[in-house]
Amino acid sequence: MSDKTATPRLSIGLPVYNGQRFIRATLDALLAQTFGDFELIICDNCSTDATEQICREYARRDPRIRYFKNERNLGPAPNYNRCFEHARGELFKWSAADDTIAPAFLAKCVAELDRDPSLSGCYTRTTEIDADGKRLYDHATVLDLDSPSVVARLRSYTFVNHRHHAAPELWAVWRTDVLRRWTPLKGSFPSADRIVILRAGLHGPVKRIEEHLFFNRSHGQRSQTYLDKMKVRPGSRLVKWIGCGPLPSYEWWDASKKGRIVFPEWRWLWEYYKAVHDTPMRFIEKFASFGVLSVLTLKFVPRLGRDLVIASEQLFNRITGFGPKPTAPPASRGGPALRVH
């Protein structure tokens, strides 16, 4: 596609905030794809570095690029959703501003979607790279999301060890009509990208190509490096011993939660139940799916309990003035989604 007025087959959404360090490599990889019938939608979340200049430079050179700069920082998830709102293609893919893909990534994913109309999406195996683009290791954790059974897909996704699962499925090529079946597409809470994958996977199989064509960049500016537990659950001493739950904090995703007592594990479990409830299934599939979630609930008991214990401590400290003073988490970057939650 060479005309911005023409309707592309595929839309790529690239949310970015202060991404000057790696965005050239990301854009070069996207524009070098052997599949060229796409538009590249860049949503800049009020970057203060050279991101805008770089993006406008590329947009002048390639008419497939559509650059939008938000009037204010929307936060991470709304900026991802803003990319999708601008999409015109029948297929959609998100791209982080610091990752890259091999030249054949789009072509191979689109070919699989064309071959099997039942698929919700298609992705490839993942290789971790460093800041210089050098290979670190290949991701080992894979899921059975291409099963024709919705219950099997739910079971596989539900019981994977998410500490070792970097959610590479988020960067798949998706059918746009599948992603339009719920709103908001990506919520403003910890691990919301996993709920996107869950919902899309409930609507149809997600094909994994057994080639390492997606390169996930590890570097010091990624959100996952923010591991200060005292800031994740402000006002709590217990987090030193019992853990803090999903990272980064709820406030990082939703500034309106600043200073409030939150229950991230309860929210995550609720989103699982809501996803199954909202997805059309046969009665027996729905019954079996809720059975899977009942087992998940039992598995979640320690984490749900931790939420309650930390909330009780925070409430007690507020009433009595006892405990550490809350410290604010860093401002939301609104850029690449997390790989560790």
Segments (PLM) and residue ranges:
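Acidic helix N-cap motif at the loop->helix transition within catalytic regions
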Residues: 24, 49-57, 104
